[in-house]
Amino acid sequence: MAFELSEDQLKTAENELKKYLPMSQQVYGFLVIRNRVRSDPVRVLVDRWPQFRVIMCKPHGEQKSDLFKDALLFATDAAVLEEILSKSSVFDWSKYFCVGTSVSHTEIFKAVASAKGVPCKRVAKCYLMTLEDVSRLPPVDSSGISVSSLDESHIGLVNQTWKFGKVDVAVGLIRNMIANFPSCCVLDAEGKPVSWILTYASGAIGMLYTLPEHRGKGYAKILVSSLAKRNHALGYPVYSFIGEENAVSYRLFANLGFTEDPSYREAWFVVNEFQIFP
């Protein structure tokens, strides 16, 4: 039903996914980075080759912390997707997992979960916002501000402020992001981060946060602009997912030149959430 791609096939799949942008953005972005950076092990599976209809990026679940690293999925054929979810062993529906994919697959996930008798819910629904031309970023004044990158000593701080964090199993995800992908932060006079933004394994930028006592100083604008330029220079796509309820972040990214694709929404589905959040 599904088989794993080789290193050479991953490069071919990256080029193939460009044809389906923006719908394939997250899986495409993941392969762009995966083909250039070696981080945590991930299996990339397809239903057939080379004309695949379903492609999935699935982290290894060797440790409990690995379960918090989302699987990513892109499909051009809903019927094939439903068959794979229902009949293959790609996902163990008796355990916790989270999948990021198109919101258009909502009914498929609900139906398969219902048939298997397990709880499944959508935990996020987001706008896809991309920056097509980095050179058109508006100028930002960072004079007198210390901008750096996050390091491993900052994992706990990021985890405690991320809305999906505050649990031990999120630490592995954040550690992987800080160790392997670009990040930016503003440091105070004592060298401690007061505002930061990270890059996910898919290339999406996010986890943007500023400590309450440092808000209103323009730090978020500086960090989004800085990380966008850094990722672009590395050849990564520059984009972000903004929750539909997050009007503040939407305005920030829009004012920096990011544009929303009105035809597409990304969603995250969680199965057996009680195993992580009892």
Name each model feature, range by range.
Residues S104-V118, E244-P262:
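Conserved active-site alpha-helix within GNAT-family acetyltransferase domains
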Residues A78-S88, G216-H232, Y250-R251, N255:
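Conserved acetyl-CoA-binding loop-helix of GNAT-fold acetyltransferases
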Residues R34-F52, L67-A71, R175-C185, A204:
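A short helix-loop-beta-strand connector motif used in the catalytic cores of GNAT acetyltransferases and
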Residues M207-I222, L234, E244-A247:
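Conserved glycine-rich acetyl-CoA-binding loop
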Residues M1-Q26, K125-C126, D133-V169:
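Short amphipathic alpha-helix that is part of the acyltransferase structural core
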Residues Q51-F52, K192-V194, V248:
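Glycine-rich acetyl-CoA-binding "A-motif" of GNAT/NAT acetyltransferases
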Residues P41-V42, R48-I145, S149, A267-F269:
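Acyl-donor-binding surface of acyltransferase catalytic domains
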Residues K166-E213:
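A conserved beta-strand-loop-helix scaffold within acyl/acetyltransferase catalytic domains
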